Amino acid sequence: MSDEQYDAALSLLRRLDPKNVSVNLNSLCKIAPELAEDLLSSVDQPLGVKTCKSTKKEYLTCDYNRDGDSFRSPWSGDYEPATDGPTPSAALRKLEVLANDSFDIYRDLYYEGGVSSVYLWDQGEGDNTNSFAGVVLLKKTSPSSSWDSIHVFEVETSRGEGIYRVTSTVILDLGSKSPKLGLSGNLTRQTEREMAVDEPSQHIANLGSIVEDVESKLRNQLQEVYFGKARDIVGQVRSLGGVEDAKQKQRQEEVIKGLQ
């Protein structure tokens, strides 16, 4: 694989309809199999939903809980179908269970529905919770729209301080009854914070605070970028004011230029 091919593939995906990112990504992987692994790990796509066979609870699927054709359930901790895929250490699995219960409450409060999942994996050797990584996934769908949040993070702990590096992506797809009208896109932001850690469970509270803050900012930015641009386009097609208002505004601008 050459860097030129990889960059060209990413450039192509950026120019295609984000609504069809999964289909376009699969097509590129078939055309250039040597790019598949890198593309699948670097391109965010809408999250899948499966039901845990053991608990009957829904969970989200992505590249972070996949091993071949199997996906690990955060509720049971097992792969479905069964496989010898990577799993977190005992201490980290205990933290993962707490994280899923906590973000399930967060999801219910902020999304009033949808599905959430949290997956953790060890960074260093041994059974510890001082250095680990993970991902927080949230998804809400309606008949014509969907919201997918993906928060990938790394945690390092030293002297009672936790360093959190988070890469957050929101994939938004808004539709309407008209098949010709839709709005799709994604936004990615990186965050790094240092927060106090008294015990391992404090990591979950800290991550919850970070995710809450980042999602609020991303929502506002999406509203400003996408809806603001759509409003500008509509304004260019049909102004809200009359012709006389436009002339008055033009005269005011000319007076201001003269004063300058």
Curated annotation (Swiss-Prot):
Domain of life of the native organism: Eukaryota
Subcellular location: Cytoplasm, Cytoskeleton, Actin patch; Cytoplasm, Cytoskeleton
Keywords assigned: Actin capping, Actin-binding, Cytoplasm, Cytoskeleton
GO BP annotations listed: actin cortical patch organization; barbed-end actin filament capping; cell morphogenesis; filamentous growth; mating projection actin fusion focus assembly; mitotic actomyosin contractile ring assembly; mitotic actomyosin contractile ring contraction
Entries under SUPFAM superfamilies matching the protein: Subunits of heterodimeric actin filament capping protein Capz
Main location: cytoplasm
Cellular component terms (Gene Ontology): actin body; actin cortical patch; cellular bud neck contractile ring; cellular bud tip; F-actin capping protein complex; incipient cellular bud site; mating projection tip; medial cortex
Function: F-actin-capping proteins bind in a Ca(2+)-independent manner to the fast growing ends of actin filaments (barbed end) thereby blocking the exchange of subunits at these ends. Unlike other capping proteins (such as gelsolin and severin), these proteins do not sever actin filaments.
Subunit structure comment from the entry: Component of the F-actin capping complex, composed of a heterodimer of an alpha and a beta subunit.
Name of the protein: F-actin-capping protein subunit beta
Record organism: Yarrowia lipolytica (strain CLIB 122 / E 150) (Yeast)
